[in-house]
Each structure stands twice: as structure tokens, then as C-alpha cells.
């Protein structure tokens, strides 16, 4: 980890990350492939919990990113609880959590008319919970926002990263999941310098308690780097 006048120098290689229809799976398969557009990699997820980020990762692993008709994905209630890390959730109290998930706003930045611009969206606009007689259990289906189909299904134009679900599904921190995607995108850039303030914003660590560098490093960066090194293919 190198601190240079308020910026981080991130060095990324494949093995070194120094920083001082319906679709139901019978299980959460770690080997599934995640293909994530770069617009989604760099979107700002300020309101997402770690469990909701894991849910998004699994959603991405279950769609066909070249077929918008695959945008409806189902999870068994057991899968949903496992991804969120909320074993107490059942069909009687799942609605408030779904309200929060659907209401999360994501900021996507870009360039329009030659100047920086941004849009704010909810990624998902519909959720359904019903009892499946064939499976003999409740299932939850979610659909992405139709206005954002290009973010999920237009990979060739936007560019994308790809990796196995197992590298993020078991991460306990939303910052780890977000940073992993950023590092994946930076792999071929070698050294990359990022202002501290921008890094905070990109990770969604915008609470006042993280304004000072030390708590940001101790509570956000160091745990995220440790988890990435321990779980993912970036060592």
C-alpha cells in the first residue's frame, strides 16, 4: 500500500493485488460465470448491503447477458435467505427486505454532449413471491429495470469483465465485492493511481466516519483487500 499526497497507487496483476422464461437453480453453483458490463462495474451502490450485492452477483450469473428475454430470474426462498445472510427471513417477513432491495438507487456516470453526466436508477423494478407447487417451496422472482436492459445485456458495446461466481458470492463486505470488480477492470492497466476521495465514492463508503483516511483504511480498505486475497483469484 502506497499513499502519495492523498492518492492510492493500485498495482494490479493477475495474481497480485497490493494495496497498503424461468430459471431456478437447485443450488447456488459457485462455478457459474458472471459477465458484468463496465457501466455496472463503475456504478455507485451507496445503499446496497453486502447481501444485496451477493444477490446481484448471483442474478448476473443466471441471466444470459446476450438475451434480454432472460431478465426474469427466480430464487428459492432458501437461496434468497442464504445470499442475504438472513436466516430469520420467511414468507411472512420477506416483503420489507424486498422493498429495500427494489428501492435501492444506483448512480451510473457517463459522458453526454461532451460533458460528464450521470443518471440515477433502481436496477430492479419488480419482485414476485409465490408458492411453487412443483418445488413445494416459495420462490422469489426479480426483473431488472427495462430502462437498464442495455446495462445488463449490451456487453459488446459497453465492454465487460467476467469471472466465476465463487470469487464474490461468499464475500461478507459490499466493499470487497465492489473493489473486486474494479480491480478486475484494472488488471491490464498495471499501476493505477486513484485519488482517495474518488476511491471512497466508487466503493460507496461515503459515511462521515470515513472522511479521515485512517478509519477508511482500517474499516473499509484493509478488510476488503484481505477478503479479496483470501477468497478470490486475485492474490
Where are these regions (language model features)?
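Charged, alpha-helix-forming regions
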Residues: 3-235
